[in-house]
Curated annotation (Swiss-Prot):
GO terms for molecular function: carbohydrate derivative binding; identical protein binding; protein homodimerization activity. Required for the timely initiation of chromosomal replication via direct interactions with the DnaA initiator protein. Homotetramer; dimer of dimers. May be in a rapid association-dissociation equilibrium between homodimers and homotetramers. Formation of homotetramers is required for stimulation of replication. Interacts with DnaA. The lineage of its organism: Bacteria, Pseudomonadati, Pseudomonadota, Gammaproteobacteria, Enterobacterales. One of its GO terms (cellular component) is DnaA-DiaA complex. This is DnaA initiator-associating protein DiaA. It holds the Pfam family SIS_2. GO terms for biological process: carbohydrate derivative metabolic process; DNA replication; positive regulation of DNA-templated DNA replication initiation.
Length: 196
């Protein structure tokens, strides 16, 4: 059991090292995309399923409340938090539309959709991205594996942050770290810390 525990930690560290080498440009582009949208008076819509839903909620909460330092609230909405809306849409046998309907209702040109999907193939996330495209929104996608169907929907203005792993647990861990990194970059760009 001890060796298995050490193997989990080692694999996680190796994935972080690989991501630290492969992803800085994509994360930087994503952060600047989010910052520019906020500076233009737009908002960020976020969605994901399971652990990805938790990451979407964490991002939105960090924007609305704060990340590590006090600052004004920033407009972000996690689309997976309203159980009444989600179950009303799903009850009409539109499971694939639970996020897309919200994107069409709430999204506007200049807004950003932060779409989080471990494999990039979740139908409801794919449909949300398709809806965002019709609303002239920019997409920031957090994926893993080969990026899945989601990667093929992205245009030149969009950003994919694809975790270099084929293990769901490692991808989800890196998605959380990436979300924290994005929050840090947004805060430090919009509200640079004053050195005392």
């Amino acid at each position: 059991m001890q060796e298995r525990i050490k193997a989990c930690f080692t694999e996680s560290i190796q994935t972080q090292i690989a991501a630290a080498e492969a992803l800085p440009d994509a994360i930087s582009r994503a952060a600047m995309t989010l910052v520019q949208s906020l500076l233009n008076g737009n908002k960020i819509l976020c969605c994901g399923n399971g652990t990805s839903a938790a990451n979407a909620q964490h991002f939105a909460a960090s924007m609305i409340n704060r990340f590590e330092t006090e600052r004004p609230s920033l407009p972000a909405i996690a689309l997976n938090t309203d159980n009444v809306v989600l179950t009303a849409i799903a009850n009409d046998r539109l499971h694939d539309e639970v996020y897309a309907k919200q994107v069409r209702a709430l999204g506007h040109a200049g807004d950003v959709l932060l779409a989080i999907s471990t494999r990039g193939n979740s139908r409801d996330i794919v449909k949300a991205v398709e809806a965002a495209v019709t609303r002239d929104m920019t997409i920031v996608a957090l994926t893993g594996y080969d990026g899945g169907e989601l990667a093929g929907l992205l245009g030149p203005q969009d950003v994919e942050i694809r975790i270099p792993s084929h293990r769901s647990a490692r991808i989800q861990e890196m998605h959380m770290l990436t979300v924290n990194c994005l929050c840090d970059l947004i805060d430090n760009t919009l509200f640079p810390h004053q050195d005392d």
